[in-house]
Amino acid sequence: MNQFVSELTALVAEASLAPSVHNTQPTRWRLAADGSILVLEDTLRRLKIGDPTGRDADVSHGAAIEGFALAASCRGFGVAVEPLLGPSLAELRPVARLSLVTGQTPDELARPARLRRTYRGAFAPARTGTALDPLERADDVVLLRKASDIAQIAALNDAASLRLYRHAPFRAELLSWMRLSRGDPRWSIDGLNAEAMEMSRLEAAGASIVLARGVFETLDRIGVAGPLIAEAPVVRSAKAIALFHRPEAETPLETGRRFYRFWLEIAALGLSASPMAVLADDPLAASEIRQSFGLPLDRRLITAFRLGLAPRHPTGPKPRLPLDTLLVA
């Protein structure tokens, strides 16, 4: 049993590398008496304003489950997933039951899991050559390479972000997950720290002021809030935009699994990426993207990744919760 617990701990450590909305890391793991693994949601980490239905949390759980399955494959195990429905108990909501099965060969996407990072800065001007070509073959991706298309996405992203930021409760919730100073005790644990957002100390200090209630509204009235939060120059530095879409009827768990795999496919090509989820969350932006780029009506836009080559510079470890928090009794 001790060996199995040790193995489970190693699998959870690998699974924790998966992305989650705002890096909230809502997924918890419990070893059941029958040897299966229960996947649970820490409901205290739900984004009550940004994700009231819990869809983004479930996509995050799906990514974590895929990370677990990738790690298990390297140990010769496959993973059977049984979605669970049920009420929360002590702030933990049942999500899925995982059962390990033998005979699995290592998944080739397991290795890029340690390479994958979100890069939110301007991409290097270096050419990507044919590196993007394999992404064209995915049936759930529309790849935009024309400068005019990338510029259109950049403008849509800024407009959608401004509409969303005008919602003060959303901004307050976002700020609560932003770690804008290295003095924040949660800098290396969770949320979005300034380093991960490619912010200088000055930019991080400015963000804490600009996004504050009252200040943002005043800046918006005089027409400067939009330019201050604009990302268009950064987005236009991308070599391509990948519109990632999935079937409307697909469960968020399945969407999350494929979302993580696609991001790992990007990393395996030596590319960096940053998702622009606001383009899917904002109805006006999502509608224009559907019309402009021919997304079928039975498909849901999940996000738009900006893709390119990140400049080489040292980065700290990914902010992650300790394993004794992720594994629950």
Across the structure, where does each feature detected by a protein language model lie?
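Acidic, surface-exposed loops and disordered segments
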Residues: M1-A329
